[in-house]
Amino acid sequence: MLPVYQEVKPNPLQDANLCSRVFFWWLNPLFKIGHKRRLEEDDMYSVLPEDRSQHLGEELQGFWDKEVLRAENDAQKPSLTRAIIKCYWKSYLVLGIFTLIEESAKVIQPIFLGKIINYFENYDPMDSVALNTAYAYATVLTFCTLILAILHHLYFYHVQCAGMRLRVAMCHMIYRKALRLSNMAMGKTTTGQIVNLLSNDVNKFDQVTVFLHFLWAGPLQAIAVTALLWMEIGISCLAGMAVLIILLPLQSCFGKLFSSLRSKTATFTDARIRTMNEVITGIRIIKMYAWEKSFSNLITNLRKKEISKILRSSCLRGMNLASFFSASKIIVFVTFTTYVLLGSVITASRVFVAVTLYGAVRLTVTLFFPSAIERVSEAIVSIRRIQTFLLLDEISQRNRQLPSDGKKMVHVQDFTAFWDKASETPTLQGLSFTVRPGELLAVVGPVGAGKSSLLSAVLGELAPSHGLVSVHGRIAYVSQQPWVFSGTLRSNILFGKKYEKERYEKVIKACALKKDLQLLEDGDLTVIGDRGTTLSGGQKARVNLARAVYQDADIYLLDDPLSAVDAEVSRHLFELCICQILHEKITILVTHQLQYLKAASQILILKDGKMVQKGTYTEFLKSGIDFGSLLKKDNEESEQPPVPGTPTLRNRTFSESSVWSQQSSRPSLKDGALESQDTENVPVTLSEENRSEGKVGFQAYKNYFRAGAHWIVFIFLILLNTAAQVAYVLQDWWLSYWANKQSMLNVTVNGGGNVTEKLDLNWYLGIYSGLTVATVLFGIARSLLVFYVLVNSSQTLHNKMFESILKAPVLFFDRNPIGRILNRFSKDIGHLDDLLPLTFLDFIQTLLQVVGVVSVAVAVIPWIAIPLVPLGIIFIFLRRYFLETSRDVKRLESTTRSPVFSHLSSSLQGLWTIRAYKAEERCQELFDAHQDLHSEAWFLFLTTSRWFAVRLDAICAMFVIIVAFGSLILAKTLDAGQVGLALSYALTLMGMFQWCVRQSAEVENMMISVERVIEYTDLEKEAPWEYQKRPPPAWPHEGVIIFDNVNFMYSPGGPLVLKHLTALIKSQEKVGIVGRTGAGKSSLISALFRLSEPEGKIWIDKILTTEIGLHDLRKKMSIIPQEPVLFTGTMRKNLDPFNEHTDEELWNALQEVQLKETIEDLPGKMDTELAESGSNFSVGQRQLVCLARAILRKNQILIIDEATANVDPRTDELIQKKIREKFAHCTVLTIAHRLNTIIDSDKIMVLDSGRLKEYDEPYVLLQNKESLFYKMVQQLGKAEAAALTETAKQVYFKRNYPHIGHTDHMVTNTSNGQPSTLTIFETAL
C-alpha cells in the first residue's frame, strides 16, 4: 500500500525555548512562507511523537480492554467514559492550575479599578501621595491584564491539544474495530453510520475538553465574587446573584432540550447522508431509469424533517446567546434597583466595581459553565454511540488459518451455519469435503445456493453453529465483486509484499494484464481513484486475481473471478493462472462457467445450502447426471433449454459478494459508478480537489445571504442590530450619569450648601428600567432573526446543490470520488446548518460591542483617538498577515481530512479481502498515517490561531494601559462616572476583541464551506429533462433505431470511443453487440441514453434523440444494467418509485422473475425495508429485480448490458427465456461477452476500437472465415464453436426459410450421436 506522505519537516516546537512557547514565536517561519506563497502539504511540521495516532490509539485501547475485562468479571456493562477518564485524568488535571490563576486575575482586576475610580471621586489636585498610589493601582491593573493575555492562550492551546489527542485515539479505535466486525455486527451498522462516528461524533471531543474545567471554576468564581460584592454593596448583591442562579437552570434546561434535539437531528442526518451515498453510488442507473425526481423527493423529505429539528435547536441557541448577551445587564439592573430601593446611595466606584465583577463572573457562569454542560451532554451522547459500536461482535478467531506444520489442507466436516441467528433455515447445512495441495475444487449451483457462503466459512467469516472447518496454510481470496483501494495499480497487486520483478512479470502475464498496462500512460504506476474509476470491471477483477497470485499463499479461494471478463480472457486466466501457476496449490473455485469443470479434481454442487452431489467430472458423466437439472431452482418447470447465455458483468460494485444475503445491512460506499464506459482505454482522470486560494469573494457572501431572505429583511436586521447595541451602551451610560449626579449632589451637601435637592428616584429608575427591557427584547429578536435567515439559507443552498448534482452529467461522478461529493453534503452542509449561524451571530454581537467600547472611550477621553490609529493599523496588518496563512492551513485541514474517510470506506468495502490476507495491521498503519497527516494540519490550525490571539490581546492590553494612565494624566477634566465607564469597558475589551477578530476569521473560514457548496450549485448541466417539444405519448411504437455517423466521447476533448458509427436497427430486431473489452460496446449504450452528448445523429422512430428531453428519451427505453442496483427503501419503491403500477402488476412482474415467493416470505412483503443497497438479496436476485423493472416498464426498446454474468446458468436461462417471451415484439440490444447469449440474434454488431467492423446475421458472419466474429467463435474451442455455428444455422434457416423443417433443437455430439451432457449445461453459458 502506498506510503501516505514523505518524511516531513521536524516540529520546531520540540526545540523551542520557554519564551518562544509562550508567545508562539516558533511559528514565525511558517507565517513568512504563508505570506510569500500558498502553503502546501510538505510545509507542515511533523506530528509530535506523543501525538502520533498509533501511540494514542494503542494507549486508549489498552485502558478500554482493561475496562471490558473488568466489566466482564463484575458482570456489568463496560463504560467507555471510565476508560477515557483513567487514560487522561492526570495530564488534564494539571491544566486546571491555569484556569485557577486566570480566573483569580479576573476577580482581582475590579478591586483595583474601584481604587482608581475612588481617586477620582475624592480628587484633590494637591495630594501627590494619592496620585502615586493611583499610578501603582493602574500598574497592577495592567499587570493583571498582561497575565490574562498570556495564560488564557496557553490554557486554550493545551486543552485543545488534549481534545485532539482524545479524538485521534478514538478514531484509531473505531477503525481498528471496523476491521474486526463480525458479519452479524455488520448487519447492525452501516458504512454511513461508521463514517458519521468518524466525522461528527468524535469532533465533540475537540470541544468538550475546552470547557470541562469550568464545571468547577464557575461555581468557585461565583462564590469569590459574591464575597467581594458583599463587602462593596452589602446585601443587595444577593439579588444579582439570585438572577444569575435563576439563569443557570434555565440554561441547563436549554442544554438538555438541545441535546435531545441533537440526537434526533443526527438520526435524520444519518438517513439523509446514507441515501445521498446511494444516490451518488447508483447515479448512472438513476439517470438511465430517469428516476431523479423520485430520489429528489426522497432526499427533500428527509431534509425537511432534519431542517425542522435544526430550526428548533437554532431557536434554543438564539435564546441562549441572547440571554448571555443581556444577562449582565439584567443582573446589574436588579442589583442596583434593590440597592437604591433599600435606601443606599449609588457612587461611581461601587457601580463600576460591581459591573466589572459581574462581567468577570458572567462569562464563566453564563457562557463557559453552560457550554461545559452542553458539550459534556453532547459528548456523552457521542460516547454512547461509539461505545455501542465498540461493543459489537467481533469476528471469532476460531478457524482462522492454522499453522501449516508441513501439512496444508482445507478440511470441512458436517458444517452447518446461519448468517442470521434468528433465521430457521441454515445458510449452509451438513457440508463435508477435504481439499489438498494440487487439487481444484469447483463449486457450482444456482443463485442463492450458498456458494459464496461456503468460501466465507473457509475464510472464517461465517461461524459454524455445528461441525468444524480446519484450514492449514495461508489463504488468498478473490472476492466476487472486485476490490481495489486508492493507490497505484502496482501497490494494489503487491498489497504490502516486496516487489520482485521476475515473479511480478509472471503474475501480470498469467492474469492477462500485460496489454492493459501498456495502454495506461503510467503503466502499473497509474494511480487508481477512490472507486477504481480508472479501471473497467474486467481489469479490476484481474487486478484482484493478480493480487492473490502474487501473495504466493497455500490456499486460493476464488469467488467467480472469470465471469467479469470475456471468453478469451476467461480462458487465458483459467489455463495460465488457475491451471498452471496455481496447480500445486489448494484451489476452491466458485464458477458458473461449466466448461471448466473438466479440469477440476472435484466438483461440489450446492443447492439451498445443501450439498447435492460431490465427485469428479468423469464420475458425473458415468452416472449420467444432468447438471442442468441440478442447477435448477425447484420452482422452475423442467423444459429443454433454448439457447441462453450470459453476458458478463465486467464492472461490479466493490462490496463483499452476494453472501451477505439475509443480513440487514453492510458496507456500501461502493463503486456505484457502473463504469458502463469501457474505460479500458479511456482513462478518466481524477481531478484534484479544488482549494480555492485567497479571500472568500464578496459574491459568496451575497449568494449566501440572498439564499436566506429578501433584502428588505436584511435592512430590518441591520436596524435591529444597531438598536440592540445602542440600548446596550445607553443602559450603562445612564447608570454612570446617575452616579455622577448623585456624587455632585453629595459634594454640594458636604460643601454645606442648601440641602434642598434630592434626586427624583422614579425618573432615574423608570428610564433605567426602560433601557434594560429594550436591551433584552432587541437582543432576543435579533438572535432569532439571524438564526432563522441563516438556517433558511442553508436549506436553500442544500436544495440547489442537490438539484445541481442530479442534473450533472455522469462524467462529473467519474471525475470526483464519492468521498469528495459526500463531504459537501455532510461536512459542509453541517457547517451551514450548525456552526456558521452560531459563529456569525456571535461575530455580529461582539463586533458591535467592540465598536461600542471604543466609541465610549473616545467620547470620554477624545485624545485616545490618536494612539488608536497606529493600534488600528497594526491590527489590520496583523489580521491580513494571519489570514494569508490561516486560510491555507484551514484548507489543508479540509483536504487532509478526506483521505481518512476514503480509507475507512474503502477498507469496509474490502473487509473480507483485507482479513483474508491478514492485512489488518497494514491498513491500520495506513489509517494512522492518514490521521497523522490530518493531525499535522489540525495542529497548525490550533497553534496559528493562538499565535494570532496572543498578539491581538497585546494590542488590547496597550489600549487598557493607554486608557488607565491617560485618565490619570487628565484627572482634572474627568469625572468619576466617565472614567468608570471608559475603564470598565476597556477591560471587557480584553477577551472580547480577540474573540471578535477570531470569529471574523472563523466566519471567513466557514464561508469556504459556503463557497464549496455554491461551487456545486453551479455545475455543468446535462440537457434539460423535458423540452417544449415532447414526443407523442405512444412513441416509440416501432422501435426503429438509426445511427447516422455517430461519434462519442466521455469528456470534451477526450478520446473518441465511438467513431463514425452508422447502422440501422429495424423494428422488433434482436441485435447482439460484441467486441473485445474496450471496443465501445457500453459506449454505444451511453450514446443512446445520452449520458454524454453524441456527435452525429441517432433517430428512434423518426425522432432525433437530441431534440427531446432526457427524461422523455430515457423513460422510453428499458435497461437491465451490468450492475444490479437496489436502493434502501421498500421493494415496492424499488420496482415502482413513482407509484405508476397497481399491486397486482407488481406481483405479476415478481412472479414472472420467480421472486414472488421470496418477497412473500419477507415480514412486510412488498413493503419490507431493504437493507443498504439491497444487500439482503444475492447478486443474482438483485439482477432479477432489475428484470422485473424492465417487464413493468413495457417499453418498445430493451437494452441488456452484460446483465447475467454472476448468476448461475439456470437463472441466466430464466432471464433469457423471459426476455424472449416478454420482449418478443420489442427491439432488443444485448451486449455480451458470452457469445451463445446472442448467437440466435437477428443481427450481430461487431465493434473494434470504437468502429463498427461487421453487422449482419450471425450465420452469415460465420460463413466468412476472415470475419472478426468468426475468429471470436473459434477461440472458444472446437466443440463450442461447432455448437454455436449449428445454432446460428438453425436460427438462420428458420428465419429465412421457414418452410424447411428444422425441428431438431438438440445439439448432438457428432462423436456418438448422443446428446452431449456437456452441451446441455454449456448452452447455459
UniProtKB/Swiss-Prot annotation:
Keywords: ATP-binding, Cell membrane, Glycoprotein, Lipid transport, Membrane, Nucleotide-binding, Phosphoprotein, Repeat, Translocase, Transmembrane, Transmembrane helix, Transport
Binding site for ATP 1: 445-452
Record PTM: N-glycosylated; leading to substrate-selective effects on its transport activity.
GO terms, biological process: bile acid and bile salt transport; cAMP transport; cilium assembly; export across plasma membrane; leukotriene transport; platelet degranulation; prostaglandin secretion; prostaglandin transport
Predominant location: membrane
UniProt GO MF annotations: 15-hydroxyprostaglandin dehydrogenase (NAD+) activity; ABC-type bile acid transporter activity; ABC-type glutathione S-conjugate transporter activity; ABC-type transporter activity; ABC-type xenobiotic transporter activity; ATP binding; ATP hydrolysis activity; ATPase-coupled inorganic anion transmembrane transporter activity
Span of domain ABC transmembrane type-1: 92-377, 714-1005
Mutagenesis / variant outcome for changing residue 866 to V: Transport properties comparable to wild-type
Effect on the protein upon substituting residue 187 to W: Transport properties comparable to wild-type
Places the protein is found: Basolateral cell membrane; Apical cell membrane
Ranges of compositional bias, category Low complexity: 657-667
Annotated PROSITE patterns: ABC_TM1F (PS50929), ABC_TRANSPORTER_1 (PS00211), ABC_TRANSPORTER_2 (PS50893)
Record bears the keyword Ligase: no
Result of altering residue 754 to Q: Does not affect plasma membrane localization; PEG2 transport is decreased by 50%; does not affect estradiol 17-beta-D-glucuronide transport
Domain of life: Eukaryota
Residue ranges of the motif PDZ-binding: 1322-1325
EC number from the UniProt entry: 7.6.2.-, 7.6.2.2, 7.6.2.3
Cofactor names: Mg(2+)
Phosphoserine modification, residue list: 664, 668
Substitution effect: residue 1142 to M: 10% reduced expression level compared to wild-type; transport properties comparable to wild-type
Chain positions with Phosphothreonine modification: 646, 648
A GO CC term attached to the entry: membrane
Ranges for region Disordered: 657-688
Function: ATP-dependent transporter of the ATP-binding cassette (ABC) family that actively extrudes physiological compounds and xenobiotics from cells. Transports a range of endogenous molecules that have a key role in cellular communication and signaling, including cyclic nucleotides such as cyclic AMP (cAMP) and cyclic GMP (cGMP), bile acids, steroid conjugates, urate, and prostaglandins. Mediates the ATP-dependent efflux of glutathione conjugates such as leukotriene C4 (LTC4) and leukotriene B4 (LTB4) too.
Subunit structure as annotated in this protein's UniProt entry: Interacts (via PDZ-binding motif) with SNX27 (via PDZ domain); this interaction accelerates MRP4 internalization.
Record-given protein name: ATP-binding cassette sub-family C member 4
Lineage: Eukaryota, Metazoa, Chordata, Craniata, Vertebrata
